[in-house]
């Protein structure tokens, strides 16, 4: 860190500005806006300084070190390098903070680029290394930060003391303010400059805050690549006080959770269910009843084979407020990163997503429907039952030469794609690791042309031939 960011209160404090040109005019405008008691030293000044008449002292003379007496800050804004150097050296000897415009080496402080929503201020600086980049960032921030933020900040200051009296806990106050600032109702009142109604709304919210139940937001984390996280999902995980997350949520996405949030792993893995669903349901209710803003973070989309609906049923029965933020499901994300389109005019007019897990009481899906051609079949969590899936599809008419792919860790740096035919599915599944997605259909053949993401290609090996009832050679797993 080359510079320590800090905000200086200059109201009524003495500041010396050396120079009278356009650059000095810009600095004068900024310093006077901050309330500085400004003294300007320059033989000549721009006519535009007239707009500040009566607000500064103009000494019509050349700079000498004597001008520094009693000053708090010094700014040199001339086009004379010798004068600027003299200002810097003289101020430095007296231990004064000095800025030489556009000369970081001769500045003990610098002016950042400012986004002004007074009293809310945002400052951006590159330490003088990349002013164009700073300007672009400032323009972006200006467009992102609504104009009503200043009024909202003023209003918050008026209610702050009452919030401390009503809510003794820091976490309770933080929760109250986060919800208030995220409220569309409050934002609407501020935008209309209806300050009285806005203040009433905040005070009413404080009166209710102590007895408030929290809320749960069901958030889809997408297939793994943090760049595929939706903007709304990012906002929710950065506002959450408690995050209950699944096994499939990538570490890169968990790194985006705010640092003081409580992280609770409720992950499950095939063959090793570490947290029962009932316990997850209990935790959701418990944390929400304690008044927390809870995010239930699930890989992919929360309503796609993720028990999202079941969890919301529990919350609804318990009277817990909830909302849902959809995510990109693995079937869409992983196939795209593998270069496999789910539908294609020549190869697939439909796509079907199923889970490889057994249904209740061993009920089987409609294999006849799943085995039709010109259809892409995507199977979640299907590795452990791959041999059964293979046999059922072939026995119901799906060709054993149908192209298939198994995508491991789709959309992440660990992505690997194993390809082959339906006859080889069971053996390829033995070579794959979870989490994996099975894709069956003619569209897989397009991967040779369309693969673009830097995954490793899988190789077929240790394959043993068998024969099914239709005479199709199936490569089955040798368990001997």
Swiss-Prot record:
The active site is at residues 246, 268. It catalyses: uroporphyrinogen III + 2 S-adenosyl-L-methionine = precorrin-2 + 2 S-adenosyl-L-homocysteine + H(+); precorrin-2 + NAD(+) = sirohydrochlorin + NADH + 2 H(+); siroheme + 2 H(+) = sirohydrochlorin + Fe(2+). This is Siroheme synthase 2. It comes from the Bacteria. The modification Phosphoserine is found at residue 126. Pathway: Cofactor biosynthesis; adenosylcobalamin biosynthesis; precorrin-2 from uroporphyrinogen III: step 1/1; Cofactor biosynthesis; adenosylcobalamin biosynthesis; sirohydrochlorin from precorrin-2: step 1/1; Porphyrin-containing compound metabolism; siroheme biosynthesis; precorrin-2 from uroporphyrinogen III: step 1/1; Porphyrin-containing compound metabolism; siroheme biosynthesis; siroheme from sirohydrochlorin: step 1/1. NAD(+) binds at residues 22-23, 43-44. The lineage of its organism: Bacteria, Pseudomonadati, Pseudomonadota, Gammaproteobacteria, Aeromonadales.
